[in-house]
Amino acid sequence: MSLRTVLVDDERLARLELRRLLAVHPQVEIIGEAANGDDALALINAQQPDLAFLDVRMPGMD
């Protein structure tokens, strides 16, 4: 069983690094990414992930 996961961070390099770190865990399936709070809410509502990695400080919405 995989953990359907979303990554949310306004810094592209942070998302890339997190994706790299999670790649060694076959049970983690990254189903989407968002770069801001509004997109994150839409993504989470649409995809209903099991797990979300969230940046706590982002422009517009924290």
Model segments located where?
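Active-site residues of response regulator receiver
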Residues: 9, 55
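Helix N-cap/capping motif at the beta->alpha junctions
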Residues: 33-42
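Receiver (REC) domain active-site loop signature in two-component systems and cognate sites
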Residues: 58
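Active-site beta3 strand of CheY-like receiver
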Residues: 47-53
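Two-component/phosphorelay signaling modules centered on CheY-like receiver
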Residues: 3, 12-32
